[in-house]
Amino acid sequence: MESSVNGVDSLSEVQNSVSGVHHHDPLPSGTPQPSRPPLRASRNYDGGHQTKAIHHHNSHVINQKHSHQEGKTLKQEGLPTKLSSKQPPLDDSKGCEPNGVLESEKKRVVDNHGKNYSQPDATFCASPQNSFYSATVYSEAKESFTNTEVSECASVDKSCESEVANSSDFNESRKTSICRASTGSDASDESSTSSLSSVLYKPHKANDIRWEAIQAVRTRDGMLEMRHFRLLKKLGCGDIGSVYLAELSGTRTSFAMKVMNKTELANRKKLLRAQTEREILQSLDHPFLPTLYTHFETEIFSCLVMEFCPGGDLHALRQRQPGKYFSEHAVRFYVAEVLLSLEYLHMLGIIYRDLKPENVLVREDGHIMLSDFDLSLRCSVSPTLVKSSNNLQTKSSGYCVQPSCIEPTCVMQPDCIKPSCFTPRFLSGKSKKDKKSKPKNDMHNQVTPLPELIAEPTNARSMSFVGTHEYLAPEIIKGEGHGSAVDWWTFGIFLYELLFGRTPFKGSANRATLFNVIGQPLRFPESPTVSFAARDLIRGLLVKEPQHRLAYRRGATEIKQHPFFQNVNWALIRCATPPEVPRQVINLPQTEKDLGVKPSGNYLDIDFF
């Protein structure tokens, strides 16, 4: 989940401080409203076909700073050898957000999407007609499609906030991200946040038993508080908080609870980052992204209750592989799901900026979930339908270029086209006699190409210095300003590390690594052996000039059309068999030593170039 961080509180301090605090009023009074479970009554099925009502919103999410009392610190206490599940009632009504109500309570988006068939041994998948790619990914960017239009070429007008780098915080740890420009100047422009409105109903988790458990407790006790959860184990800690395995009292459901000390966040000027992460989590509804079940605040802590992934992260899983690298088949599975996650985020105007194996978690069914959004950048995006010319189809790549109805696994031939996906208006008006005289390789002339959806925030610009040293894009290191192309650079580094067991530009120290990223060419080791397609994809992604980088203009669509993914059925990717399914046994710590995580304490201020 998140790695070591300076100033992390122990598990007992979280629970003991909550039980013994006297409430003051650090924030304007209000009532925090957690996210609600999706209503099954809103799901509408008719013969296997689903309908979706998309409501467009033009309202904005206004960032508001919290007012916190200074000087409140946690009392250092010894860790208990046995965690207690008994906690006194806690009134958090005085420690909520200034507005008191989540955006999700104000905006209802009824989204009757298909079920998430993510069981590793499932024998049934939704039919391609019901789950082809345009229905499973493109339509999920519900509230960001405010200005979708059809044009002859991509006409994407995007704007984003500019962040000024005033200070530097670096961590020598490989697992900890670095962040500069946390002074509060990285607030999003109000006009760029309309796509981040909270989604009340999340169809991808409609049948999740965790929703039922939360609803049962809420019906019985009202608002969820810290007393309703029993913290079992510390899973990890990061720059703005610690993550615990938590069990909802009276149920057998487990969650991952991120606990953040509000006083420390205020002192380190990280409140805005915590708020950004919460708002992003509220807006997500995707099979490979986390679900925020609820969130609440005490006088001291801000807590996010999310999905728990028992499989750990891909970094730990890679360490257990022979040679400490994955097979190419396994890599293709993991990076394909990560690619869809990044595509969805970009459609919402979210640049992730922190992709690395440590942030890719493995669910209980073996599929992945992207985590940690506190470094993400929010910006505006204008999804555009672009008419594709026949020239795009006849280029020498030798693989299909159209998503949705054209199978990506074969060359443009008659048997590649699904007749059910086309209506007569897509066919040419020539007679059958003329059509029969056409050779097979001219089939593309008979079909009007489907438009492509371009939703890449290419004009987004930020001056922040954020990320992990080995994954930083050259434009970030140079301080030239960066946009969505940084996610495709990190995607290339991520692909390289999974295939070869190490990153391509790692130096003897962090400073040497940064110089290698800027000045050293990309090299591949002799072992292990990987396919030409994999190397070619990495070369396209790790181009140092962002404007020449693969996916710079057309986003994930370009990458999905690469030969490396030619055997991927994007429509049914959730039904694919994972390379490895984690064991369901959770080993809980038994001693204080197992629970304690010491802060790294090695933050440095470094001037680059």
UniProtKB/Swiss-Prot annotation:
Stretches for region Disordered: 1-51, 80-100, 429-448
Record: active site: 354 (proton acceptor)
The EC number(s) this enzyme carries: 2.7.11.1
Domain of life of the organism encoding this protein: Eukaryota
Catalytic reaction annotation: L-seryl-[protein] + ATP = O-phospho-L-seryl-[protein] + ADP + H(+); L-threonyl-[protein] + ATP = O-phospho-L-threonyl-[protein] + ADP + H(+)
SMART domains given in the database record: S_TKc
Protein keywords: ATP-binding, Kinase, Nucleotide-binding, Serine/threonine-protein kinase, Transferase
Record field: compositional bias (Polar residues): 1-19
One of the record's GO molecular function terms: protein serine kinase activity
Pfam families assigned: Pkinase
Annotated binding of ATP, by residue: 235-243, 258
Protein kinase domain: residues covered: 229-565
Entry's family note: Belongs to the protein kinase superfamily. Ser/Thr protein kinase family.
Protein name per its UniProtKB record: Protein kinase PVPK-1
Organism: Phaseolus vulgaris (Kidney bean)
